[in-house]
Every structure is written in C-alpha cells, then in structure tokens.
Amino acid sequence: MAPAETTGNVQRPEAGKQSMGSFWTQMFPPKPTYTEEQVPDLTGKIFIVTGSSSGVGKEAARMLYAKNAKVYMAARPGPKLPAAINSVQEAVPKSGGALIPLELDLADLAVVKKAVEKFTSLETKLHGLINNAAVQALKDTDGDARTAQGHEIHMGVNVLAPFLFTRLLTGVLTATARQEPPGTVRVVWVSSMGTETIGEKRRGLSPDYVDYWPLMSPLERYGLSKAGNWLHGVEFARRYAADGIASFPINPGHLKSDLYREGGALFKFALKPVLYPPTYGAYVELFAALSPTLTLKDSGAWSKYVEMVYFPDC
C-alpha cells in the first residue's frame, strides 16, 4: 500500500512492514500441532462462535460440540444456520453438548444488541467467545455497501459490530471469570495477515479511517478492518486482564471458505495454491480459546497458526 497518496486534505496512511519470515510462515504454515485431539472435555462449558453457519466457524463449533460443550452458533437469519446445526449434529451424533441457534446480523447494531439480550436471558455464564464472522466485499469498488447504521461495510461488520457484541457480553464474561481459573475465560478476535501488510504503522487502525477509506480498494478496506480486530484484541486484553479474562487476536490463515465468494476467477485462481481446509483455521481458534500453554501473561499476543505467539510491529 502506498504511504503517501493524497486527495484534498486526506492522505493514505503509512502501512506497517511485514518481515519476510512472517510472510513466508503465514503463506505456507507448518503442520498443526494443536488439533481437536488436544481439546479437553468441555462438559458444562458455554461458547459463542459467530459466523458459524459455514467454513471455519462451523468447524470450530463442531469441534467444541464434539467435546460436549454447549455452543451458541451465531449467524445471520436464514436457512444456512439450521442446516449447519443439523450437519454438525449428524457429524457428531453422540455429543453430550448442545447446539443453540443465535440469530446475529453484524450489519445491524440493533440486531447485535438483541442477540446479546437473547443470550443473557438464557445463560449466566460464557466461557469463550470466538469473534469469527467477517465480510469481504470485493465487488464494492465504489464503497456503496453500508450497514443499517450507514457505516462502510467492512468497518461496520468486521470492527464495530464485534466490538459492540463483545462489549455487551463483557458482564457475563467477567462474572464467569470470577468462578474459573485465571485466563481460562477467553475472547478470540479473528484477524488476518492484513494486520501486518495493510494495517496503519504503529496503530493498526485509527479514527482517521472514516476520512481516508474512500481512497482504499475493497481488499485494503478488508485488511484494515482486520487490523481493527487485532487492535480490539490487544486493548481488551489490557483492560480485562485484572478480571481474569484472556484475549487473543489471531490469524487463522488462508482458508477455503465463503469469505472469497465475491472474488473474481483470476483472484481465486491465484489464491488456490495457498488455501487450506477450514479445519486448519478452526485449530487456531481453538488453540487461542483453549490451549493450556497460553496464560494471562500471553493475553493480547498475536497468534498465527498453531503454537506461534508474538507481538507484531504494526
């Protein structure tokens, strides 16, 4: 991304620099070492996985359910969500857990609030929140796609909505953390390599975005929104470590999912050699949500692939 293109008084931000080692590792990840085999029994544990009607989110929900967790599968209203629940139940017929649908449209903050109200009317505990859902509007070259509140679609769906969802669930998270070992109640923020390649240098994402985003391509807007997820993950860790909650922004990798559905044939062809099964992304999400090797001391660290935790220089 060019560091100094200007239109009027608005300037494109300078992007951070990704090391070659980081780029290579994220494009060609090592064999995963934290898989569903390492996931412990989760009887009595409650999780929310957003965007779980397909892809990585569905795989993460399946793995949690297979270990007897109660999983709220949060996704947009429509036939895909009940179909996903039926699919997971068929794949794991002997689970002692439960799959609960939770209608969640991240393009409307009013619906986000209603989803939280429904959850808190049913539950008093939440052991893990995986903010997995996202949109990549590659066809929105003119920036016309907006949320119900009028926000640019990537900022609204990928940044503002997960922030509000998590903020409104913080009360039940902190209440649960008081009853659990420190660092075992966790929030996972699914980011991407865009944090390092497109995110604003030393900031990730700033309020300046509302002014400069029209200068950016849809793919750049997506990458910047993912930097926003990283920023929220780090800041949530700082604010709530004292309450015993761990927070991890992660890069699940380049995966075969619905995320790229708006990409053209050439775009998809170029990505094909570096796309991995959604299961791999779910492994990273579960590593961040459950691995005993991570503690409160690691909270806020950037997790990419399995057993790789570090702090990037954005």
Swiss-Prot record:
Region (Disordered): 1-27
Keyword presence, NADP: yes
Pfam families: adh_short
Enzyme active site: 191, 222, 226
Pathway(s) annotated for this protein in UniProt: Mycotoxin biosynthesis
GO MF annotation terms: oxidoreductase activity
EC numbers for this chain: 1.1.1.-
Oxidoreductase keyword on record: yes
Catalytic activity: dehydroprobetaenone I + AH2 = probetaenone I + A; betaenone C + AH2 = betaenone B + A
Binding-site residues for NADP(+), renumbered to this chain: 56, 80, 105, 132, 167, 222, 226
Comp. bias regions, Polar residues: 1-10
Alphabetical keyword list: NADP, Oxidoreductase
Function: Short-chain dehydrogenase/reductase; part of the gene cluster that mediates the biosynthesis of the phytotoxin stemphyloxin II. The first step of the pathway is the synthesis of dehydroprobetaenone I by the polyketide synthase sthA and the enoyl reductase sthE via condensation of one acetyl-CoA starter unit with 7 malonyl-CoA units and 5 methylations. The C-terminal reductase (R) domain of sthA catalyzes the reductive release of the polyketide chain. Because sthA lacks a designated enoylreductase (ER) domain, the required activity is provided the enoyl reductase sthE.
Family of the protein in this entry: Belongs to the short-chain dehydrogenases/reductases (SDR) family.
Full protein name: Short-chain dehydrogenase/reductase sthC
Organism whose genome encodes this protein: Phaeosphaeria nodorum (strain SN15 / ATCC MYA-4574 / FGSC 10173)
